[in-house]
Amino acid sequence: MKWFIMTLALIVAAAEDPMLSVIPHATVVGGNVRITCRVPRNPKNRAVVFGFEDWTTTSRQLYGEESPITHQILFEGVPCDPGELFCTVLRADGKDRKVVVPFKVVGC
């Protein structure tokens, strides 16, 4: 029974986490990268912030369960060492959710 409860808790927590997809997974200096952050609907969601850790980010306001699920942006002219890609969902209850994906720039 203990394992069942722990597994169920992990599944519920994972269902609330954002998902991040990246196209392409690596680029040359000055290349373009399209990222899509998928945010499960939740009445406590207030904002989504996504982008590169050390270069640039963008944010969008969320309206709880009325918010769009996918948020997409094209970053052009990616520099050397922009950092990892991330997607963070800011929540009203302070239990923010974040996913991080490594990214590589070649030719630096």
Name each model-derived stretch.
Residues P40-F52:
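Solvent-exposed loop/turn segments flanking beta-strands in beta-repeat/beta-sandwich domains
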Residues A13-V33:
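Short, compositionally biased P/S/T/A/G/V-rich stretches that sit at domain boundaries
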Residues W3-V12:
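Sec-dependent N-terminal signal peptides
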Residues W55-P68, P102:
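Solvent-exposed serine/threonine-rich low-complexity stretches and specific carbohydrate-binding patches
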Residues F75-P82:
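Surface-exposed, short loops/turns at beta-strand junctions within beta-sandwich domains
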Residues N32-P40:
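Short edge beta-strand/loop segments characteristic of extracellular beta-sandwich folds
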Residues R91-V100:
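Short acidic/polar inter-strand loop motif in beta-rich domains
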Residues P102-C108:
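Short beta-strand edge segments in extracellular beta-sheet folds
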